[in-house]
């Protein structure tokens, strides 16, 4: 669902900016290319989303609460 993917992308972006982390720093630290996900060039898996949440010390449950708000 493209709408859900867009919400996930926007929520990741908000969390990343809240923590003051650049795309480059995030990629260097995790190897996850958020720009590709954000541009819709690749889909996001649950395991990738889990890695993103772990990086920001956020549970998947809390991430989805942010997604709904």
Predicted regions and their residues:
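A short, Lys/Arg-rich alpha-helix, primarily the initiator
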Residues: 1-19
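Helix-turn-helix DNA-binding elements, focusing on the entry/boundary residues of the two helices
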Residues: 12, 23, 46-49
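The alpha-helix within a helix-turn-helix
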Residues: 16, 27, 53
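Short alpha-helical DNA-recognition segment
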Residues: 19-36
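Key DNA-contacting residues within the recognition helix of helix-turn-helix
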Residues: 35-38, 64
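Short, basic-rich loop-to-helix N-cap that marks the start of a DNA-contacting helix
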Residues: 41-54, 60
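Short C-terminal boundary/hinge segments that cap the last helix of small helical domains
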Residues: 57-69
């Amino acid at each position: 669902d493209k709408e859900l993917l867009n919400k996930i992308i926007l929520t990741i972006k908000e969390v990343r900016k809240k923590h003051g982390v650049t795309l480059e720093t995030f990629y260097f630290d995790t190897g996850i290319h958020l720009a590709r996900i954000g541009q819709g060039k690749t889909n996001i898996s649950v395991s990738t989303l889990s890695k993103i949440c772990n990086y920001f010390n956020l549970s998947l449950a809390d991430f989805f609460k942010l997604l709904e708000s």
